[in-house]
Amino acid sequence: MKTVVALLLACALSLPVLAEEEKKEGAAPQVIYHNLVPALVGNYGVGPRLKFYKADVALRVTGVDAEAKVIHHEPLIRNQLVMLFSQQTEESLASPDAKELLRQEALKQVQQVLSDEEGRPLVEDLLFNNLILQG
């Protein structure tokens, strides 16, 4: 009888451990927002007056491996974004719709860079945490 009770107790104590292992195996990959730090700062537009921008950018990736690859290629990503921002005109940044188009174009370019380097885009979305324009 004592043996049966001990066996049942041992089985009961091991169930939470088995449930935890199943949860880890079936868990969805973690979504990570990787902030490009420091913020992107530069000038844009043409004309006699310099116009400046400051953009705090976050990249959404799924999984730690994807984030590690994005971090590895961050200098290339930053360069691509700086070049994109420097090509903008005052008109292309004047409205919220224009800023959304810029965000979408930035996402496309980041995905293209990562596709060229890693064989797949890795970044699912690009977000402007803050976009400041001074003209």
Locate the predicted segments by residue:
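Flexible, low-complexity charged segments
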Residues: 1-135
